[in-house]
């Protein structure tokens, strides 16, 4: 961590910020010698947080300052509560009066910091109630509201309710933005960033050797995800079924997969993902020859008209336009599919050729369909 702040990038960032302060109109060059001390001590501490955690989510420094303030004021309250428990605190009587009660509620709701004033008012109420209860028992009814208020909003004692002291600050102690605090408190080891580097003397030491088994696993996983199977086992069921019907012709497996309704809709560039299409079909929003089809494994025949629910026409048009603007249309409509984007109607014309077939891998007999495209 100390080495990081000696880095050129940190020094460059520090000089830029310092130059920004000097360039202000309110800055006078006579103060330069005084502000050098400010640059070395205070500014370095602020930059230390900003440079290291500037890639964290929005509002990190705000939440950090908020939690530190909460801790500071809670610590003051604990100190007062423990050492000045039996003494009456110097709080104006007007703050604990009934007239100020309504204003006080609004003030405490809007205030972001659990201030020392809030605790002192409640403490003054308890002291006043104890005096009244001992001397004048007939005043119990008039002070009953104060008693209930102090019991409900009683400041937590450390020995009894240790967890409630930092109740409000728990909302801001999150793992993402205050991870360095937790690591410091628990004395955890720092996570070292691993940079892959090649050994200069013997480069073969760092090279990864791919076995045939590893290539097969990559192949099966890539194909199963491409065609919408979350598990490789589900892909093998279709693969074995098509292999039995086509008598071992592996090309027929992919012809069978392209004929499935979910894969057919994916080639039209109308939907964001194949998993979205699965839910879209299951809810009965796809029609084949004006009949609702609610299962994804439906095999299309030639010249069957596929249409959609009219409720989602605007959303589909909007999705097409957004994809065209972002230039994210990866594949045009294939040659074996005919699509009308105005009417939102499509049909399967013929079986795909080997060139027209959409596939995530290269068909090569030498590697037995195991060479992955990169």
From Swiss-Prot:
Q: What does the record give under GO molecular function? A: rRNA binding
Cellular location(s)? Mitochondrion
User: Which keywords belong to this entry?
Assistant: Mitochondrion, Ribonucleoprotein, Ribosomal protein, RNA-binding, rRNA-binding
Domain S4 RNA-binding intervals? 259-323
Ranges that cross the membrane: none
GO CC terms? mitochondrion; ribonucleoprotein complex; ribosome
Pfam families, per this entry?
A: S4
Q: Which CDD domains match?
A: S4 (cd00165)
User: What superkingdom heads the lineage?
Assistant: Eukaryota
Fetch the InterPro entries from UniProt.
Ribosomal_uS4_CS, S4_RNA-bd, S4_RNA-bd_sf
User: What SUPFAM superfamilies does the annotation carry?
Assistant: Alpha-L RNA-binding motif (SSF55174)
Q: Which residues form a coiled coil?
A: none
Q: Which family does it belong to?
A: Belongs to the universal ribosomal protein uS4 family.
Q: Please give the name of this protein.
A: Small ribosomal subunit protein uS4m
